[in-house]
Amino acid sequence: MQQPQAHYLVLTAVGTNRPGIVNTITRHVSSCDCNIEDSRLALLGGEFTFIMLLSGSWNAIARIESTLPVTAAELNLMIVMKRTVCEPKAPYPAMVWVQVDVDDSPHIIEKFTDFFASRNLDIAELASKTLARAGQVPLLSIQIAAHCQNCALEQHSVIDDFHALCQKLGAQGNINVAVHSQPEQP
C-alpha cells in the first residue's frame, strides 16, 4: 500500500511565556495528527516564540489550520501559518560558522548579515544576545551558520574578509569553514 503524500505547514506562535504553554501547543499539534519535523523555541524578553515545521496528511494539516486559531485566541497567542513543501536539497559543498563578540551598537548585526549576503552565503541559523557589563557598553554576542556554494574555491578570501570586518568593527571573531567532499561525477 502506498504511503499518502505528506503535506507541510510552518507554524509560528508568539505569546507571553508561562509554564506549560509549549506543552499545550504540542498537545494540540498531536491531537490533529500532525508530526513536528523541526522546531525552535526562544524566550525574548517576557515573550516566547515557538517555530515548527509540521507534517501530516492533507486532512491533518487542514485540521490544525482550522482549529489552532481558536486555541491560540484562548491562550492569547499570535500565530502565523504557511503551507510549504519539503523537497530533498542537494548538499551544499561547504558550511561557514562564525562567532563574534563586539561592543553593541545599532547596525552591527546588519554588517555581519551583509557580509554573508554580499558573498552569496545562505544564512541557515543566526543567534544573538546582548549582555550587560558594569560601567561598559553592553557586549553583543553573535553566532551565524551559513551554507556556501563556492567556499571550496573562495575559502581563504572569506576568512580574510571576515577577519578584516572584525578588525574594522573592533570585534573579536572566529570563523570556521568546513568543505565537504563531493562524490565524483561519472
Regions of interest found by a model, annotated:
Residues 2-186:
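A conserved regulatory-domain signal marking ACT and ACT-like small-molecule sensing domains
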